[in-house]
C-alpha cells in the first residue's frame, strides 16, 4: 500500500518527526510504502523564523510552492495521502482539494489548534498569512482525522464523524533515563526548558520566580531552542543549541523539567509533548495545569501541575530540595509514558486507521 505523507515542515520539526516519521519503520514492516514530502526544506525551516532575510525567504518560498504543486502530477501513484497539518503553510487548501478531486483519500493529522491564530514574536509574519478557516474544510473532506488530544478531537467532530484521538508519543527504547539519573551535578540540579523560538515566551513568563528561587537554591537553568541569547539576572544559564542528534541527551542532562504554558485555547490544543519527552527520560516535571497536561500528569504522583506563580515556586522548590521526591517522580513518570505514550502502543492503531481509510469508500 503506497502512502504519500505531506507535511509543512521537515523532520527537524518535532511534529513531522513524531507524528509521521517515527512510525515509518513499523509501517514498512506491515506492508506500507511511505513517501514523506515536506514543504519546507531543512535549510528554509532554519531560515523562516530568523529575523529579516525577507527577499531570500520570499524567493525560496516561491520555489517551494512550485515544487509542491508538482506533487499533483504523481498523486495517482498513491493509495492514500497522510496529511500532517497542511500541504502548504499558508492560503486556502488548494492542494488538498485537488487531491480529493483526483479520488485519493486523505487521512488528516493535526496536533495543534491550527484553527486558531497564534502570534508570537518569532512567527508574526508567517502567522498573518495563515488561513485558519481551511482546517474545518480539510476535516470535512478527509476520510479520517487523527487529532492529538481530546480538545482537538472535539473540534474535529464538529465537521466529521470519523475522528480518532491519537496522542503524540515517543519511542521508549530511544527516550529512556540515563544510567546515572541519581547523580547530582556539583552546581546543584539542572532545571531544563527545551522548546522553540515560538514557545520561548512561556519560559520568560516564569523568569521572575526562577530569579527568586535562585536566591534560595543552587541550580542551573538549561535552555535549548530559544532562538536568541538567554540571560536571567542572578540565574546561572546554560544556553545549548538544539539538534536532532543531541535531542535525547538534552532531556537526559536535566534533573527537573519545566513546561510552562498560558491558560488559553491555543495551549489547550497542545499535546503535552515536552512533558512526555522529559518523563520518558525519567526527568520529573513541573507543568502548567492546562489542557492535556492534566491527563498526562497526576499532580503529586508522577509530576507536578502548577496554576499560579505561587504554585510554580512551591513545587519547583520541593523538587530542587528533595532528591527522594525527584526519584519517585522519575520512576512514576517513566511508567506513565511506557503505558500510555509509547509509539509501540499507537503504531498498530495508526496502521489500522491508514489501511481502513484507503479501503473504505
Describe every region a protein language model picked out.
Residues 277-280, 284-287:
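Short hydrophobic beta-strand element within catalytic cores of glycosyltransferases
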Residues 11-26, 36, 171-177, 182-253:
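Conserved catalytic-core segment of nucleotide-activated headgroup transferases in glycan assembly
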Amino acid at each position: 500500500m503506497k502512502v504519500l505523507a505531506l507535511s509543512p515542515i521537515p523532520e527537524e520539526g518535532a511534529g513531522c518527526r513524531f507524528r509521521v516519521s517515527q512510525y515509518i519503520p513499523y509501517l514498512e514492516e506491515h506492508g506500507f510504502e511511505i513517501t514523506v514530502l515536506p514543504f519546507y526544506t531543512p535549510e528554509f525551516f532554519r531560515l523562516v523564523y530568523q529575523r529579516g532575510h525577507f527577499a531570500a525567504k520570499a524567493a525560496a518560498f516561491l520555489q517551494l510552492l512550485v515544487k509542491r504543486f508538482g506533487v499533483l502530477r504523481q498523486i495517482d501513484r498513491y493509495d492514500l495521502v497522510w496529511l500532517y497539518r497542511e500541504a502548504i503553510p499558508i492560503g486556502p487548501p488548494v492542494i488538498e482539494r485537488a487531491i480529493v478531486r483526483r479520488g485519493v483519500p486523505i487521512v488528516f493529522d493535526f496536533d495543534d489548534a491550527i484553527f486558531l491564530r497564534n502570534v508570537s514574536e518569532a512567527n508574526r509574519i508567517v502567522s498573518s498569512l495563515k488561513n485558519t478557516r481551511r482546517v474545518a474544510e480539510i476535516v470535512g473532506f478527509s476520510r479520517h482525522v487523527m487529532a492529538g488530544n481530546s480538545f482537538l478531537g472535539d473540534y474535529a467532530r464538529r465537521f466529521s464523524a470519523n475522528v480518532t484521538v491519537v496522542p503524540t508519543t515517543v519511542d521508549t527504547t530511544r527516550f529512556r533515563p540515563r544510567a546515572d539519573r541519581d547523580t547530582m551535578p556539583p552546581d546543584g540540579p539542572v532545571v531544563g526548558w527545551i522548546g522553540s523560538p515560538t514557545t520561548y515566551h512561556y519560559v520568560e513568563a516564569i523568569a521572575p520566580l526562577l530569579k527568586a528561587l535562585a536566591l534560595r537554591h543552587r541550580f542551573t537553568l538549561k535552555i535549548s531552542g530559544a532562538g536568541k541569547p538567554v540571560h536571567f539576572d542572578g540565574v546561572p544559564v546554560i544556553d545549548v543549541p538544539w539538534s536532532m542528534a543531541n535531542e535525547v541527551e538534552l532531556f537526559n542532562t536535566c534533573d527537573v523539567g519545566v513546561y510552562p504554558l498560558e491558560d488559553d485555547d491555543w495551549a489547550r490544543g497542545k499535546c503535552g509533548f515536552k512533558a512526555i519527552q522529559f518523563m520518558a527520560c525519567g526527568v520529573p516535571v513541573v507543568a502548567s495545569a492546562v489542557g492535556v497536561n492534566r491527563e498526562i500528569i497526576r499532580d503529586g504522583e508522577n509530576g507536578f501541575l502548577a496554576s499560579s506563580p505561587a504554585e510554580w515556586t512551591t513545587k519547583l522548590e520541593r523538587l530542587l530540595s528533595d532528591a527522594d521526591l525527584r526519584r519517585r517522580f522519575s520512576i512514576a513518570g517513566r511508567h506513565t509514558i511506557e503505558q500510555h505514550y509509547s509509539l509501540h502502543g499507537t503504531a498498530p492503531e495508526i496502521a489500522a486507521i491508514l489501511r481502513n481509510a484507503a479501503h473504505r469508500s
